[in-house]
Each structure stands twice: as C-alpha cells, then as structure tokens.
Amino acid sequence: MLQVILNIRLDHKTSDVKTMESSHERMEAIVAELESSGTVMEKVPIRTCNRIEYYLSVQEIPPGFEFDGFTVEGDEDALRHILRLASGLESMIIGEDQILGQIKAARVQALREGTCGPVLDMVFTKAVHVGQTVRRKTQINRGSVSIGSAAVDLAESIHGDLKCRKVLAIGAGKMGTLVARALAEKHLSAIMVANRTYERAYQLACELGGDAIHFDRLNRALRDADVVISATGSPHYILTRERVRDAIPPERRSAVVMVDIANPRDIEESVRELGIRLFTIDDLRGVAEENRRRREAEAREAERIVEGELKLLLRSLKHMEVEPLLAEVRGNMESLRRREAERALNKIMNSSDPEGVIEALSRSIVDKIFHDIAISIRQAAERGDEEFLSMCAKLFNCKDLK
C-alpha cells in the first residue's frame, strides 16, 4: 500500500482498567509525536470502557520509532482487527452491539474534525457494513450481550435474585442505558436512576418503571441501595471513599455490592476499605468467558464473514491507490482528444472531403498516444527490462516476446 494503515491499541485482552486509565495520555503523546513527524495523513480514535485505540493512515513509520509497549498492527492485520471489532468478536462480551455504534460515532466525529480522509472513511464504512452483516446473518448478539448486562449478571451472581433488592444505576448515557435495560429484563420493582441531568434520569426511569434521583440526593439513594452499578462519562470519581462512608451506615456496608463499569472509573478503589464489595470491568472476565463459550459456533461463522469481507476491502483499497494515476491518464487522453477534435472541426468546415478529415483525426490521435508508448518500450528493450516489456504485453493484450 502507498499509505500504511496502522492500529495502535490497548484493550481488555492485554491490560486491566487501571492500566488503561493511566495509558490514555501516553497513547495520545505517541500519536502527537507521529503527527509532528509529518507522516500522519488521517486518524480516527476509538475509546470505550475497555479499549483505547487509534487508527492512522501514515506515509511511513519513522525508523526506530517506539510505541511504548502498545499493541501495534499494520495494513492487513489492522484491517482485520477493525472488522472483527465491529462484528463484536474483539469485545469482552462477544457479540455486544454497543461497539458498532461507537465505531459509527468515531467515524462521524473524525469526519467532523477533518481528521478522517478517504482511506479511513472507506475502512470505517466497511467495518460498519461488516458489523451489520454479521449481526444479520448470525445470532452472535442474541439475548442480553453487553457490558451492562454482564454487570447485572455479576451482581445477581453475588446477591441471587435481584427482585427483592434495591438497585441504583448511576449514569443515563449510552452505557447507563444498557445497564438500565439489562435491569428491566429482570423485571425488578425497585430501580433508582441517578444522573447529573435530572431530565435524562427521569426519562430513563419512566421507561423502566423506576424512580429518578436528583444528583444532589445521591447520598440518600446510596443509603438504601443493595446494588450500585455506575457507568457515567465523568472524568472524576462520582463515589469517593468519603462520600460512601458518609452515605452508607457501617452495619449495611458488607451487604452492598458496587459494580463500576466506567472508564475512567466512577468509584474510588479505597471504598473496599469500608467493607463494600466493589467490582470493576476486570471482574467481568468470568461472565465474558461464559458468554464466549455459548457463542463459539456463531463466532466461527462471524469470522468466516470477516475474512471474506477483508479480501474485498483490501481489493478496494488497492483500487483507491491507483485512482489518481487513472484520473491523470484519462485527463491527458481527454486533453489530447479535445485538441485534435477542435483542429478537425476547423478543417472539416472548409473541406470537401470530411471523411478524409475524420480519417486523419483518428490516425493523429493513435500516433500521438503510440509515440510515448513506443519510446518507453524501446528504452526498456535497450536496458533489457524484460519485466516492463512483459507488463506492457499484458497491458495492451499482446503476445509476450518470450
């Protein structure tokens, strides 16, 4: 490829949530360093609760460039990864749908910011298409498959049936909505939804038949909750050790389960010191493995689809590489045609032999096109360039000289 497609990433397969939190700025610094070298043509970042990724289209990778321990893949491997990612095959919860929306959003945002050009636009558009195809042709996303549903399953594995428990969901964004829907599938009667924007909390609570909580009354809701699942987009802790200590009486703390699926994390790790049972995305791996086993057959079919679509994408990208050359060749031919046509039209108006003018026109066009071709072929023969001569024979559908 004339441009190298590069994927730099850190995800749940290689890192825990704490490492991902602390590595975001390092990855951005690496991308910025690459950009400063003038080699980056396009870029699209993807950040979710369990991955940080950059897709780059670069002219070259500077010799000796260090990627500081991040996973780095190029060209075919990078393209395979984005297609697998969109299909739900790279997710912690195999088959989850949220990643497809996140890839769509990443493309739209990069287009808006002017960092996604024709190469990555083609790649991301194809990825979305493949993700949709996999979900249409397989049952990989059948049932409740999301980080949100896994968090609810984890809480249920500890507390048992949640129908007799009070559950507090913090966050009403995309991830919080997934949590809420997973709770709704359990037909729970005591669901509380808290969000900084009360209107959004109220809207989601109405859908669930639960109660919306003003954020300034979060401590009161914490006091009554048996299960807390937090999934906001806040850059800072929502539940600090001090807040939890003040909100939950000591005698209740050992019975409270908190699941933090945000990145950056919403709940300060030191709340464990209070006796609270705190779980993070890292603790969902057991749930994820069970989900993986259940979906093995569907995953194999999805992988077959991905490999077929990857071949088509590679071919399309190769076609894209030569489009400027084809456009220039066609432009040169068109300029020649116009010049010769104009000359012929001027002659034909004053000629008693229009057929002769047309004959001369066609011969002139052929001679001018053939002139440069003939020079190149003769020069190749002089230097013994058999590969070039063979290529010309194929290009003009002629017999090889051999």
Curated annotation (Swiss-Prot):
* Active-site residues from the entry: 49 (nucleophile)
Kindly tell me the pathway this chain contributes to. Answer: Porphyrin-containing compound metabolism; protoporphyrin-IX biosynthesis; 5-aminolevulinate from L-glutamyl-tRNA(Glu): step 1/2
The protein's matches in Gene3D superfamilies, at most eight in alphabetical order, are given as:
Glutamyl-tRNA reductase, N-terminal domain (3.30.460.30), NAD(P)-binding Rossmann-like Domain (3.40.50.720)
Query: Where does this protein hold NADP(+)?
Result: 171-176
What Gene Ontology molecular function terms does this protein carry?
glutamyl-tRNA reductase activity; NADP binding
For substrate, which residues are the binding ones?
48-51, 91, 96-98, 102
Question: EC number(s) on record?
Answer: 1.2.1.70
Q: Where is this site: Important for activity?
A: 81
Q: Does the keyword Thylakoid apply?
A: no
Q: Which reaction does it catalyse?
A: (S)-4-amino-5-oxopentanoate + tRNA(Glu) + NADP(+) = L-glutamyl-tRNA(Glu) + NADPH + H(+)
Q: Assembly and partners?
A: Homodimer.
Q: What does this protein do?
A: Catalyzes the NADPH-dependent reduction of glutamyl-tRNA(Glu) to glutamate 1-semialdehyde (GSA).
- HAMAP family this protein is in? Glu_tRNA_reductase
Mind telling me what this protein is named? Glutamyl-tRNA reductase
Taxonomic lineage: Archaea, Methanobacteriati, Methanobacteriota, Methanomada group, Methanobacteria
Tell me the gene name: hemA
